[in-house]
A protein has these predicted regions:
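Bacterial Sec-dependent N-terminal signal peptides
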Residues: 1-21
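Short, hydrophobic/aromatic-rich segments at coil-to-beta transitions
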Residues: 34-40, 65-73, 93-94, 151-155
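Tryptophan-anchored aromatic micro-motifs
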Residues: 22-49
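Short, solvent-exposed loop/hinge segments that bridge or flank secondary-structure elements
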Residues: 40-67
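Edge beta-strand at a domain terminus
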Residues: 110-115, 151-185
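An exposed acidic His-Trp-rich patch
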Residues: 85-132
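Acidic, glycine-rich flexible loop segments
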Residues: 121-149
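Mid-chain, structured segments of secreted extracytoplasmic proteins
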Residues: 63-100
Length: 185
């Protein structure tokens, strides 16, 4: 009888452990309620006249979601070239930047980013630049991106280590807007 009880307790604890959601998985899940919605953003740090962002309407769209990949186009004015791609594998989240041209072809600088070095938190993931990024854009080798998401807001942030380069844009997730924008690619 004692062995049966121990076996049952072991089975319950294994089932409970499997049922727990990792921080990285919870981060990916946080996008799900926003699928198909658009949100307006504002630059909260690093914006300056002539940077291509300041003074433009900033929109994000959670265009697609599944448990392993989330695509979030980032529209800057009429420029529909940018999509943030979050991928989940081996309990880590990866961020890649997909850049396309207006004719639907890939930009020569695309798919840069990095993978979180740990499972992060349910509301924040950090992405140091990976080797692929360094090969593609040598000056971006010291980039660190971090993204936050909670019930009220989404932020995309970039810091270039060793410089004063900081860029942050924040989106209000409590106020979805109507848009028919779609990325160029």
């Amino acid at each position: 009888m004692r062995k049966i009880i121990l076996f049952m307790l072991f089975s319950i604890s294994v089932s409970w452990a499997r049922a727990q959601t990792s921080n990285s998985k919870a981060f990916m899940e946080a996008f799900k309620p926003h699928l198909g919605k658009y949100y307006e953003g504002t630059i909260v740090a690093g914006g300056k006249e002539g940077d291509g962002f300041t003074g433009e309407r900033l929109l994000m769209e959670v265009m697609s979601w599944d448990e392993r990949e989330v695509k979030v186009p980032f529209y800057v004015g009429e420029d529909k070239s940018r999509t943030w791609i979050f991928s989940w594998s081996n309990n880590r989240v990866e961020l890649k930047h997909d850049h396309g041209k207006s004719d639907g072809t890939a930009d020569k600088v695309t798919f840069y980013g990095g993978t979180a070095p740990n499972e992060g938190t349910p509301n924040m993931q950090m992405f140091p630049a990976d080797a692929e990024t360094e090969q593609l854009i040598d000056y971006a080798a010291y980039n660190v991106w971090w993204v936050t998401i909670d019930a009220d807001k989404f932020t995309y942030n970039l810091r270039r280590i060793g410089s004063d380069r900081l860029f942050s844009v924040e989106f209000d997730l409590t106020k979805p807007i109507v848009s028919n924008f779609k990325p160029w690619r």
